[in-house]
């Protein structure tokens, strides 16, 4: 499912206009992104938690030349699914 299909599904499920559903999806993505940038987790009880995991600086290799290089530390967005979501997916 892509973004436009998600917007249509939300519009149908919540009996909203497609425009209102699009505004909701865009606002949700914007708020979650900003919270992760600020170092906060976003938890939807039963559904899951969005969080930013910190990876340490590490050594790597340039695949083209084989030269060693340093890969900088960075944050990576992650999602941990909640129990209710896991149960729903597994039947």
Curated annotation (Swiss-Prot):
InterPro entries given in the database record: Hist_DNA-bd (IPR000119), IHF-like_DNA-bd_dom_sf (IPR010992)
Coiled-coil intervals, chain numbering: none
Top-level taxon of the source organism: Bacteria
GO annotation terms (biological process): chromosome condensation
Keyword Nucleotide-binding tagged: no
GO MF annotations in UniProt: DNA binding; structural constituent of chromatin
One cellular component term from this protein's GO annotations in UniProt: cytosol
SMART domains referenced in this protein's UniProt entry, alphabetically: BHL (SM00411)
Keyword presence, Transmembrane: no
Keywords noted in UniProt: DNA condensation, DNA-binding
Family: Belongs to the bacterial histone-like protein family.
Known function: Histone-like DNA-binding protein which is capable of wrapping DNA to stabilize it, and thus to prevent its denaturation under extreme environmental conditions.
Record protein name field: DNA-binding protein HU-beta 2
Species in which this protein is naturally found: Neisseria meningitidis serogroup A / serotype 4A (strain DSM 15465 / Z2491)
Organism taxonomic ancestry: Bacteria, Pseudomonadati, Pseudomonadota, Betaproteobacteria, Neisseriales
Gene: hupB2
């Amino acid at each position: 499912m892509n973004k436009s299909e998600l917007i249509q599904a939300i519009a149908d499920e919540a009996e909203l206009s497609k425009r209102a559903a699009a505004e909701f999806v865009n606002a949700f993505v914007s708020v979650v992104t900003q919270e992760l940038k600020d170092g906060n987790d976003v938890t939807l009880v039963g559904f899951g938690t969005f969080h930013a995991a910190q990876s340490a600086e590490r050594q790597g290799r340039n695949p083209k030349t084989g030269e060693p290089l340093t890969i900088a530390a960075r944050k990576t967005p992650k999602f941990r699914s909640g129990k209710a979501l896991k149960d729903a997916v597994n039947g």
